[in-house]
Amino acid sequence: MQIMSRPQMLVVAAALGLAFSQTVLAAPAAALAGNPLATASTLPFHYPAFDKIKDEHFLPAYAEGMRQQLKEIDAIANNKKPATFDNTIVAMEKSGALLTRVQTTFGNLQGANTNDKLDAIDSEMSPKLAAHGDAIYLNPKLYARVKALYDKRDSLKLDAESKHLLERYHTDFVRAGAKLSAADKEKLKAINGVIATLQTTFTQNVLKETNASALVVDTREELAGMSDAEIDAAAAAAKAKGKDGKFLVALVNTSGQPPLAVLKNRAVRSRLMAVSLARGANGGEFDNRQVVLKIAKARAEKATLLGYENYAAYSLEDQTAHDTAAVNKLLGELAKPAVNNARKEAADLQAVVDADKGGFKIEAGDWAYYTDKVRAQRFAFDENQLKPYFELDNVLINGVFYAATKLYGITFKERKDLPVYNPDVRVFDVFDADGKQLAIFIADMYARSNKQGGAWMNEYISQSTLLGTKSVVANHLNIPKPPAGEPTLLTYDEVKTAFHEFGHALHGMFSNVKYPRFSGTSVPRDFVEYPSQVNEMWAVWPEVLANYAKHYKTGAPMPKELLDKVIASKKFNQGFMTTEYLAASLLDQRWHQLTPAQIPTDVLAFEAQSLKDMGVDFAPVPPRYRTTYFSHSFSGGYSAGYYAYLWSEKLDADTVEWFKEKGGLKRENGDWFRAKLLSRGGTDDAMNLFHNFRGRDPVIEPLLERRGLTGK
């Protein structure tokens, strides 16, 4: 679950702290005549005209967008008048209107609905966009104006948000290399171009390798345990790939694969686990091992050039964690108890295998299957009992939306008149409690072969009172689409994901800021997952669950005893879940705490040794992502930042306790959370926002209790 919980994008204006303006400041060039990207969409809230946008529109719009922004930046940098907040900082906030529109639209479509043409454009534009960013942030005249304002910021009589914006711009320039010598700036530009190209290659390799690695089986019997609908879908997928009469089991992003929980055939489970873990290291054209080494080295070189010990130190300085010591401490303290719990869980699973006279030791491919058996014994239910109560439309309308209405007073109305890029995409108007339209919400729920894996939120239009814009946000999930006429039944994890991603959407839709630099989810990476994690609590809140968890055939509510078992089982398998997450987080840190001279030559050997060194080398529980398909770390914006989910969960667990103390699903609670935190975006230090909401700093005890790490 990522926001970045969003597709892998290079939204230049966002990354640079520049505007999400939707108004072109200069007349589009003749080359853009008839190009729908040339001007802001005339649809409500500047919603993209998906029916008019074609692949061939992007490259000329990119070129003109970069030209326009550089012209605007040149005018700011060479302004003969002394620097003022308005003629420098605000002017930069308003720059790049066309480029922002092009890059936002392209990045979102390339994540959700890509093709070979878009992939080729991405490969071509990534280094060009990196160079474009360098041309702005390494402009000495522009930095001189920013620094002049920064040095006298206390005497400028700026309001709090404006002062924070000035400070952020100064920080952004310094971190981008504005203080480097001319020679070192040229070195940095070259490194940035290399990184941009490599990250694009990594992303495309992961998607292509994941598709190419789908497991093909010969007989229906081998898929025993999967539902008839799932097996029929596997047959249809195989036929679509020219393998008529066979069955194709597609892969998801993570190491673990959903069918592993139900497949009865151990040989098939082992094959499925093996192809998942081998992705990106098969020796073919999509092998990512050399790409990983080059990315790690380039990032380490960038950090060294900027004066940091390693890339993690550079990356974390700008997060709420601030340094590697804090992250290493958190992850290190949790690793041993988490693995101990996982070993205890493995013993429970082995006992079931032995009782069944299985004659084998539990391996990674067996874990989910026997976990379900133990869950069924201990709590007397399994996933298949839950799914009939989790029909997609009920979950979204009567669950996710219902909770938001009860908490915040917002309402939703589906509309069919706006264009979409895929027929399965749905669009909703979102209205505030006073009846005024707040935002437009796009729901893209189904998996597709041309859609990146995982789940994320992104914004097509970001809220800003300076620019007069309101939010157009989208949630993307990867729920397998059932055969025509069959209901879409979700797993419990998919239900939680739907609530999680809508937490990101609320963060975007509730944004009430002046400057686009601070809009919505424009907060530190280790804070951005916090509001979305909080929103997960409503998935099993009794009033909410009773409203949506109804049998898709009979409409009967989920029996209370089944709900009680679901809630009672929440700590179950936490050893596994915490260990697989920690293993990935620690790998992410290990790769990014290397100096250029320490980059290894063998990716898999380094990975194995790192897991051993960190005490999380427990074979039945592989990392949630192995290095060669770890998109968060090597292309998805979470480099040296995968720890952020756990860091944010500390805030989340503490906030859940606050909601419970205050009576839970009450409008006054939602209004307080919205006013103090969700609406504020990045207008203040993230931990100040938390303190203002909670009345104190966060404590870790609720997280330890949730994860079963208290030793009780």
Residue ranges: model-predicted function:
Residues 480-499:
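Short pre-active-site segment immediately N-terminal to the catalytic Zn-binding motif
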Residues 1-25:
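Gram-negative bacterial Sec-dependent N-terminal signal peptides
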Residues 97-108, 167, 171, 274, ...:
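Short, hydrophobic/amphipathic alpha-helical patches that form generic packing surfaces
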Residues 75-80, 84, 311, 413-417, ...:
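Surface-exposed patches in mature extracellular/periplasmic domains of secreted proteins
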Residues 29-54, 225, 241, 246-248, ...:
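C-terminal, non-catalytic "cap/extension" segments appended to globular domains
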Residues 161, 165, 197, 204, ...:
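Active-site-proximal, well-structured secondary-structure segments within enzyme catalytic domains
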Residues 27-232, 659:
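N-terminal helix-rich structural modules
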Residues 42-57, 106-125, 148-190, 250-290, ...:
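Short His/Asp/Glu-rich catalytic/ion-coordination signatures at enzyme active sites or charged loops
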